[in-house]
Design a protein with these regions (language model features):
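A glycine-rich, basic-preceded beta-loop-alpha segment at the flavin cofactor/substrate interface
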Residues: 194-207, 214-231
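A short, Trp-centered hydrophobic/proline-enriched beta-strand micro-motif
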Residues: 117-125, 171
Length: 234
């Protein structure tokens, strides 16, 4: 098997490497020591198209293959773990689920600005009592037929990009179903925008490393999500 990079891939890797060395590395120590979220670096990456590398061009991305995206995250992470995880959480955990499972309307409304870097994404699954075990989570969304809305209650912890994100994929329990002789929780993913009433931020975590990635608690108290955002349990 030949693992040699193509000329196109090598050019992309060199672009990522030069950006990381010239723009990211000089700030890395300060970012980590001061827990500073590097908004200025994110803005530069937006202009270069780093925030939507694997997203198809028709949705505002660069239309590159997974290897190109991996090389970007790798080169950024070599010099600054914070910057690498900001990009990977935004792309893999927020933009990609919308690309893979979202409706066309959701892709136009959320994926396009995410891929262009106009908005930052985050993903909320982890909870204090369950970790990343989706079946163990306590966050729930109940459908309100009177208003045609989902009402979201619960909290998430250790969420990368925290309060700096604009669009969040939030996982919640939306029902129960019997499978293989036992009751299982039905799980749904919701797109929640920053500023939605009932959605606030809690603790900012103190970490041993990757300290600039703004790891926050997300709190949902009767947070209402329009039903047209999509179907449950899919």
């Amino acid at each position: 098997m030949d693992f040699t990079l193509s000329k196109k891939h090598e050019m992309a890797r060199q672009l990522f490497k030069e950006f990381a060395e010239n723009e990211v590395k000089p700030l890395a120590q300060e970012v980590d020591e001061t827990e500073h979220f590097p908004e200025e670096t994110v803005a530069k990456m937006q202009k270069l198209g780093f925030m939507g590398i694997p997203v198809p061009k028709e949705y505002g991305g660069q239309g590159c293959d997974p290897l190109t995206y991996i090389m970007c995250v790798e080169e950024l992470s070599k010099v600054c773990g914070t910057t690498g995880v900001i990009v990977s959480a935004h792309t893999s955990l927020c933009a990609d689920p919308i690309l893979t499972y979202g409706t066309e309307e959701q892709k136009q409304k959320y994926l396009v600005p995410l891929a262009k870097g106009e908005k930052l994404g985050a993903f909320g699954l982890t909870e204090p009592g369950a970790g990343t075990d989706a079946q163990g989570q306590q966050t729930k969304a109940v459908f309100d037929e009177a208003t045609n809305e989902w009402v979201l209650n619960g909290s998430k912890c250790f969420i990368t990009n925290g309060k700096y994100a604009d669009v969040y994929i939030v996982i919640a329990v939306t029902g129960k179903v019997e499978k293989r002789g036992r009751m299982m929780k039905e799980i749904s993913a919701f797109i929640v925008e920053k500023g939605t009433p009932g959605f606030t931020f809690g603790t900012k975590e103190k970490k041993m490393g990757i300290r600039g990635s703004a790891t926050y608690e997300l709190i949902f108290e009767d947070c209402r999500i329009p039903a047209e955002i999509g179907r449950a349990h899919v």
